[in-house]
Amino acid sequence: MIDVLPAGSFQVEGADSDAECLVLVNSKEANSVMAEEDIRGLFEQIKVDAEFVDLSKETVFDYTGYDNIVFAMVDSSLLGQTAYEILDWVQNGGGLMVYFPPQGDYFFRSLASQMGVQESGWEMYEVPGFRFRTDLMLGGQGKDFIIEEPFESAHTLSLSDDCTVHMVSADERELPLLWQRQYGDGMIVVMNFGIMGKAYRGIYAAAYSLLNDAFAWPVINGSAFYLDDFPSPVPSGTSTYVERDYGISVGDFYTNVWWPDLLELAEKYGIYYSGMVIEDYTEEVESPFVPNQNTQRFQYFGSALLKNGGEIGLHGYNHIPLCMEGFDADFGEGYIQGTYERLFDYDYWESEEDMRASVEELIRFTEDLYPAVTPEVYVPPSNILSADAREMLVREFPQIKAIASIYFEGDVEYTQEFEVAEDGIIETPRVISGCVIDPFMEISALSELNLHYVNSHFQHPDDVLDEDRGAASGWEAMRGRL
């Protein structure tokens, strides 16, 4: 059962409250624009009330009434004498965070010694990955996190002994990437990292928390393991890798190998699965929708899932996303029309009435099979959900309390933040997926564990059939990596 908090309890304080942080940006610098977007998204989640000053438009501002200041610009010389005055302010008890490495010019070098920099080179450093020297982040210490597409993002430098280094590059050099330094009565925190984005928010939140003796923000403290397309019709016949490793049909593999293994993992790690029902894999998009009469496996798997503490949710009458033609017409700048048709071999729904009828049939099917269950979570097929369909779900199906799609922006997918939307729907995105957890997902999982105290994962039964999702390695290897 999902308990819903009022939407207002998740919102940042109103504009009439005093901002605790001043963020200095420059809208004429690409990195600064990226950082501002990053900071706004982060601060909304950790409930920091901040004021932003664009140094390309105003260079005279009052910084004395804030607890903390964030530098998020490439050219720090825009600050002029104010930069030294801010350092004096820090010395008297303020907090200063350098959000990304500024331009390594003479002006910044004149400030760097106060930030703990002993020596600095002129070249930038390609960070192959990172590791934590301290226990700043849960699950971070003692492991290397690899960056799949590194670039020259960090200053080459060495630090004075009075710096506490939390994060370094994951190589022999161990270049300092995140450190703090007590400066008089205040604190300076430097992110010499230069890689930003949603996947790294938890690291930046942890860095910001170092500015003060104590810092708290609201967290969810929860974990979710979604089984998309489960229960669902089981494919007939066998598959290349199941036949290779087990010599049995896909149906027998699911029943006798895959599902028992998942139950064993659930018992070992205290996992409760959320199974998202697909009634049929028909391509029908016009009502009336024919009920699936072959329910034996639905009853077997669904009952076992519920018996083991799991939940049943809604995925689709079929696996066609709830979208009508033209749903992506307003996707905005950067989106190429036709992307949906190019990437996905799906038909469009004929009308909103047809979409509604398909969900009605799915709910009837699910509640007939599991009378004690009222499904409250909806997962969009292929994580795609049109705005019209979302509005329809909220309006027509009040039993749906949460929508679980994805956290990171895709091509046409429904992207979410962890929040309660204005219409009361709980947005609960999934962060990682599948059995092959790649380096990006490892970083994302670490970040979200520390930002929201959340783990949110989904997989499909047919992952083991799909070479792109690791099937060639075999289920034993996939299970081990999971």
Where do the PLM segments sit?
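A glycine-centered loop/beta-turn motif at secondary-structure junctions
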Residues: 19-21, 154-222
